[in-house]
Amino acid sequence: MGLRVYNTLSGNKEEFVPVEPGKVKMYVCGVTVYDHCHIGHARANVVFDVIYRYFCHLGLDVTYVRNYTDIDDKIINRANREGVTYDLISERFIKEFDRDMERLGLKLPTCQPKATEHIDEIISLVQTLIDKDFAYQAGGDVNFCVEKFDSYLKLSGRTLEDMQAGARIEVDERKRHPMDFALWKEAKPGEPFWESPWGKGRPGWHIECSAMSMKYLGTTFDIHGGGKDLIFPHHENEIAQSEAATGKPFVNYWLHNGFVNINSEKMSKSLGNFFTIKEVLDRYDNEVLRFFLLSAHYRSPIDFSDQNLTEAEAGLERIYKALAAVEETLAAGNGCTGAPVDASSLNEAEGELFDKTTSISARFGEAMDDDFNTALAMAHVFDLVRCVNRVLSETAGASDNICSLCTLIKAEVAKIAGVLGIFSSKPASFLERLKSRKAGNLDIAVDEIERLIAERTAARKAKDFKRSDEIRDQLAAKNIVLLDSQQGTTWSVK
């Protein structure tokens, strides 16, 4: 059936048909760089990173543009508070954003333009709107005339009358309509400015995204994304000014991710109930955060809490333990031929594992083709993991069939890992990393754990099972779980 995406513009799932066959052009609104990013920003960027990765996985040629808003009232206000220039603020937080995105494991977009590097394009677009009588000068400002654009508010499904009746808008007598918005702002004394036909000033918020997206992607492109909070006014205004200027449809598919909530309230700086990406990644592995953010459908709200992150951590640990068992089986089967699986030689359990492994890519693809349903995609991964655990636990030794199956499992999971940006660490490394993080929260030192395990090993050799059991119980009381195998005793944290 092909890929179907939910288009905010139509309110329906639609078949995805790119403007140019074999190519995808997508633009995602980046951050205003005046402060550290919170995990609401993490969600938007992880969501569109996975969408970007999935298009690449499908073999499409993707141009992905994500901007920086590096001039804005918030940036200027912070610069004034700190007594520095605006560009020092923006450059500082661009670096912080880039560091956060790197820690989250995001692929770099094709292009990351800055508003301040596209002033000429912005001025040209504003002038076009004036020439076409969609914009007017008001002192040193230039405003967009919303009443001139017949389909204004078509993205959010509102009306000007409803907006005006329910709005608390400061009256500006220079505006022809209270909902008119700024394309160009006259510079106040002491503010950064650029020369323009309307005097010294700077861009409004919305115009920069239209100018930059159309420069790199053309007048009509495939996908524009962002958080639901951007539907109005930002994306609504982008549509108005872009389509007024070109007379063509601006974007074919509008995608919006849901909010991250705390206690059923949207997480945001303005509400003061936010956690920065850095704060969360200092406490949890980056893959755990990605796993958590992808555990719900991207359009649904997701509730952030330590409990939910701990549950995500436990889920990811289960998957990695299964992958570790696959690695251990392959390591134990040094003499395996590595030949392709001979389905006719498999027993019933092996046959079930073969079927689930060979179908995982198709099931994963079906989930992703249904509006990038990562929650369902994850469910298919867990289904495979349960089968892996059952079959490997019931299998004695590493037969050629089992080794061939494990090789196949590794290859299939690697494909999924490339799309989701998780499961890509070496299993042993991830589990050790996770154990170290958990151990940091214990009230017993790692050295003491290792000492007690060594003492228990000696007690077992001496057949002092009473002491052996005492040590196991002592460690269990500290949330330490012991696992005995032919290779020795390993431990993990509950």
Curated annotation (Swiss-Prot):
A motif ('KMSKS' region) lies at residues 266-270. One of its GO terms (molecular function) is zinc ion binding. Keywords: Aminoacyl-tRNA synthetase, ATP-binding, Cytoplasm, Ligase, Metal-binding, Nucleotide-binding, Protein biosynthesis, Zinc. It catalyses: tRNA(Cys) + L-cysteine + ATP = L-cysteinyl-tRNA(Cys) + AMP + diphosphate. Signal peptide: none annotated. The keyword Transmembrane does not apply. It is found in: Cytoplasm. Zn(2+) binds at residues 29, 209, 234, 238. Belongs to the class-I aminoacyl-tRNA synthetase family. This is Cysteine--tRNA ligase. It comes from Geotalea daltonii (strain DSM 22248 / JCM 15807 / FRC-32) (Geobacter daltonii).
